[in-house]
Amino acid sequence: FCLADLNRALVIDFITYLQGKGLATNTVNTYISSLRALYNMACQESLVPASYYPFENLKLRRAMTARRAIPASLFQQIAQIKVADDPQVELSIDLSLFSFMACGMPFVDIAYLTRQNIRGNELVYHRHKTGRMIRLEITSSMLQLIRKYADRQRATGSSYLFPILPPGNPDHLRYKRSLAQHNARLKRIGQTLRLPNPFTSYVVRHSWASEALR
């Protein structure tokens, strides 16, 4: 396939193909936006004729996503859930609370936190996604959760603050598996609380952002 051969009919056919695969509207829009960006770059490099633009007047509407944020009061209910017989669910509860208290810290950043990230009364780390350095005050509630798992982590020889990843340098596939398991447990917690939408690590982040804007 050559970009110079791209025309409006092919774009429409591609949209139809993606929709036929059962992809959500926003996912289809992401694919088309990426294709359009690539085509625009080719235009700038004079690799395709600028006289014809296959995306002209093509409106990509984003589907309205369900409101995902939950009120801060629900995190108090989550903290009170008793799951002494299921340490993995208990861990997911603790991680969701820690994320909310840590200004919506992403799961990936929590997973890779080590004792070296603790500087006095602050957490100093780099965002896994952007590399940006973050300095965050460790509140008493956050410190309580860190201490809860400290002895267990030392006993296993792990420098990570939380028992999400095995000691050493786990591969990305291991992290993705841990994230999937975490979200599956959060979904069960959300069902227990009868939340209208699935409860995930993203919901935790979105909830903190919504509270911060109040």
Q: Predicted regions: what is each one?
A:
Residues 84-87, 183-214:
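Short, basic (Lys/Arg/His-rich) helix/loop patches that form interaction surfaces
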Residues 1-66, 81-84:
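N-terminal core-binding DNA-recognition domain of tyrosine recombinases/integrases
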Residues 5, 112-148:
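Conserved tyrosine-mediated DNA breakage-rejoining catalytic core shared by Y-recombinases
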Residues 52-107, 111:
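Basic, Lys/Arg- and aromatic-enriched nucleic-acid-binding interface segment
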Residues 75, 140-196:
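Active-site/catalytic core of tyrosine-dependent DNA strand-transfer enzymes
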Residues 40-49, 99-120:
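Short, charged phosphate-coordinating catalytic segments
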Residues 4, 48, 61-80, 132-139, ...:
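DNA breakage-rejoining catalytic core of tyrosine-based enzymes
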Residues 11, 35, 98, 110, ...:
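Short, basic/aromatic-rich helical patch in the C-terminal catalytic core of site-specific tyrosine
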